[in-house]
Amino acid sequence: MMKKLLIVSVKAYQKYISPLSPPSCRYKPTCSAYMLTAIEKHGTKGILMGIARILRCHPFVAGGVDPVPEDFSLMRNKNTSKNAEKA
């Protein structure tokens, strides 16, 4: 139940609030898409992963590819980012 409520909240943000400002996320997938995937994979702990990701998304970071890790972690998935840069 809580998981569904969180997902609906993020989807409402994506549909109604996000379009009001220009795209500014420095990561792929976007921070809101990351949070959705994190919640789907890790349940309510995924919200912590999403918040950590939002805190990492600012003008002083290069950004890049940062998918949701299979195991719960609040850190950026650095191995995937390096592999994406080589490709």
Swiss-Prot record:
Signal peptide: none annotated. Transmembrane segments: none annotated. It is a peripheral membrane protein. It holds the Pfam family YidD. It comes from the Bacteria. InterPro entries: Membr_insert_effic_factor_YidD (IPR002696). Its main location: membrane. GO terms for cellular component: plasma membrane. Disulfide bonds: none annotated. Keywords: Cell membrane, Membrane. It is found in: Cell membrane. Could be involved in insertion of integral membrane proteins into the membrane. Belongs to the UPF0161 family. This is Putative membrane protein insertion efficiency factor. It comes from Streptococcus pyogenes serotype M4 (strain MGAS10750).
